Swiss-Prot record:
Keyword presence, Glycoprotein: yes
Subcellular location: Endoplasmic reticulum membrane; Lysosome membrane; Cell membrane; Cytoplasmic vesicle, Clathrin-coated vesicle
Residue numbers on the Cytoplasmic membrane side: 29-47, 119-141, 207-302, 383-405, 505-537
Family: Belongs to the LIMR family. LMBRD1 subfamily.
Ranges facing Extracellular side: 1-7, 69-97, 163-185, 324-361, 427-483
Cellular component terms per the entry's GO annotation: clathrin-coated endocytic vesicle; clathrin-coated vesicle; endoplasmic reticulum membrane; lysosomal membrane; lysosome; plasma membrane
Annotated motif YERL motif, positions: 229-232
Protein name: Lysosomal cobalamin transport escort protein LMBD1
Physiological role: Lysosomal membrane chaperone required to export cobalamin (vitamin B12) from the lysosome to the cytosol, allowing its conversion to cofactors. Targets ABCD4 transporter from the endoplasmic reticulum to the lysosome. Then forms a complex with lysosomal ABCD4 and cytoplasmic MMACHC to transport cobalamin across the lysosomal membrane. Acts as an adapter protein which plays an important role in mediating and regulating the internalization of the insulin receptor (INSR). Involved in clathrin-mediated endocytosis of INSR via its interaction with adapter protein complex 2.
Encoding gene per record: Lmbrd1
Gene Ontology biological process: clathrin-dependent endocytosis; gastrulation; insulin receptor internalization; protein localization to lysosome
Locus of motif WTKF motif: 291-294
Organism: Rattus norvegicus (Rat)
Length: 537
């Protein structure tokens, strides 16, 4: 019992160290992208905190799996200390952890982040007082609070199972509803709300992560255009525009006024000339920068990283395809959320994670790598696509020049994507997320030649969805993810959409040429001349 307690403490200590690493990563990540001129303390802290909570929630996944696996021996029997009370206590500890973290996520998504966002939107108007800003922000935030309340009510009051008897009265149905409400409906309400956010995260992952998984490695492999060649092209463009301006101005040398068309063309040419000269300054700065020379020396390493990332992307895509194909061929159908009893088509990650889970914390390391990979590929997708509302581009994400409102949007999207990674990992390795490395005993008839008869032998078998409930403990993560079958069905179809968008993004990324070393300078009219270092990085 003492050894078991010591091992459990070690597991939670590693989780604590991971919390510190997450906070450090979020601080560096947010500071890297926030604008140096428009930096706001509240928006920065909000972005760091919300992203950290999402990552901490994902970090709880391997702890959950480790705890349910650690209660059983490899031969399928429970350990001596793992009685019913201890098992329930461990499950409740993880469950309360999820309750706390998911409640904080709901608070961030439906109150704090919208409030801070609308507060800074009102702050742009210099005529308004702080009191007016707070009142206006609270007024707009109230709409998000109402949405959150509706989601909680729907999750709590809508029963999953109504009476099967068609002759049952309405009173019996209402009675069953309130009986269900008193039995764990807090879990159902929270699960419904989080699943709704995860569904939005799935859409964000389809839009940004799927494209970023192809764009990031190919951009690393292709690299950027030559700075010297870009300067030469830019110089030629400057000379051409200056000559065009001189031609237009020569028309008014004799005192005649320019026509409206010539004045409009002259104005456009002058704006174009200012942009080209601004590009020239930045190109000159980058060409002479020591950072550019250092990055040039690291070019082979970037190619290696690009090849590694594309191989990892192909591994994920193949695993996700095989997992979805298994559900399409062998699942219990859409009414069950495409649950699969057993594993009929194995995929690489589904085989690897249960093996690593037996040697703690190797699965921790792999899960961390997967989550960070999703973060970086999502960030690559957001940087390439931008933040859009239908056909309207709201914000651009630029290193060192992201506005506070855009930073909040960015962390909101990443928070939702990280929420969805738990289901993505389940899709890649359903057995691992559901039961870890648990085994249970089944009786097998064996024919013995020595005794001229049959004998019964208990043999261990890996836990799956068809296993007895009293023999295999389901992770709390799985309980949250699959409380409502229709969300699981939506995730299943979303995985197919994810694969399609990845293939489209792969084709688009292959067809696109190399990026400019000052990508986005033409679009940023608010770029000041004292910020060239943002591009040099």
């Amino acid at each position: 019992m003492a050894a078991a307690a010591a091992d459990l403490v070690i597991g939670w200590c590693i989780f604590g160290l991971l919390l510190l690493a997450i906070l450090a990563f979020c601080w560096v990540y947010v500071r890297k992208y926030q604008s140096q001129r428009e930096s706001e303390v509240v928006s920065t802290v909000t972005a760091i905190f919300s992203l950290a909570v999402a990552l901490i929630t994902s970090a709880l996944l391997p702890v959950d799996i480790f705890l349910v696996s650690y209660m059983k021996n490899q031969n399928g029997t429970f350990k001596d200390w793992a009685n019913a009370n201890v098992t329930v206590q461990i499950e409740n500890t993880v469950l309360y952890g999820y309750y706390t973290l998911y409640s904080v996520i709901l608070f961030c998504v439906f109150f704090w982040i919208p409030f801070v966002y609308f507060y800074y939107e009102e702050k742009d108007d210099d005529d308004t007082s702080k009191c007016t800003q707070v009142k206006t922000a609270l007024k707009y935030t109230l709409g998000f609070v109402v949405i959150c309340a509706l989601l909680l009510l729907v999750g709590a009051f809508v029963p999953l199972n109504l009476p099967n008897n068609n002759n049952s009265t309405e009173w019996e149905k209402v009675k069953l509803l309130f009986e269900d409400l008193g039995t764990g409906q807090g879990l159902a309400a929270l699960s419904f709300s989080i699943s709704s956010l995860t569904l939005i995260g799935m859409l964000a992952a389809i839009t940004y992560t799927a494209y970023g998984m192809s764009a990031l490695p190919l951009n690393l492999i292709k690299g950027t255009r030559s700075t010297a060649y870009e300067r030469l092209e830019n110089t030629e463009d400057i000379e051409e525009v200056e000559q065009h301006i001189q031609t237009i101005r020569s028309k008014s040398k004799d005192g005649r006024p320019l026509s409206a068309r010539d004045r409009r063309t002259l104005k456009q040419c002058e704006e174009r000339l200012r942009t080209l000269r601004k590009r020239e300054r930045h190109l000159e700065f980058i060409e002479n920068s020591w950072w550019t020379k250092f990055c040039g020396a690291l070019r082979p390493l970037k190619i290696i990283w690009g090849i590694f990332f594309i191989l990892v992307a192909l591994l994920f895509v193949i695993s996700l395809f095989l997992s979805n194909l298994d559900k399409a061929l062998h699942s219990a159908g859409i009414d069950s959320g495409f649950i699969v009893f057993g594993t009929n088509l194995s995929n690489p990650l589904n085989m690897l994670l249960p093996l690593l889970q037996t040697v703690f914390p190797l699965d921790y390391i792999l899960i961390t790598i997967i989550i960070m990979y999703f973060i970086f590929t999502s960030m690559a997708g957001i940087r390439n696509i931008g933040i859009w509302f239908f056909w309207i581009r709201l914000y651009k994400i630029r290193r060192g020049r992201t506005r506070p409102q855009a930073l909040l949007f960015l962390c909101m999207i990443l928070l939702l994507i990280v929420l969805h990674t738990s289901y993505m990992i389940y899709s890649l390795a359903p057995q691992y997320v559901m039961y870890g490395s648990q085994n249970y005993l089944i009786e097998s008839n064996i024919t013995s030649d020595a005794h001229k008869g049959n004998s019964t032998l208990a043999v261990p078998k890996r836990c799956d969805a068809d296993a007895p409930k009293d023999q295999c403990t389901v992770t709390r993560t799985y309980v949250f993810l699959h409380k409502f079958w229709f969300f699981s069905a939506a995730y299943y179809f979303g995985n197919w959409a994810f694969l399609v968008v990845f293939l489209i993004g792969l084709i688009v990324s292959c067809c696109k040429g190399k990026k400019s070393v000052i990508e986005g300078v033409d679009e940023d009219s608010d770029l000041s001349d004292d910020e060239p270092s943002a591009y040099s990085a």
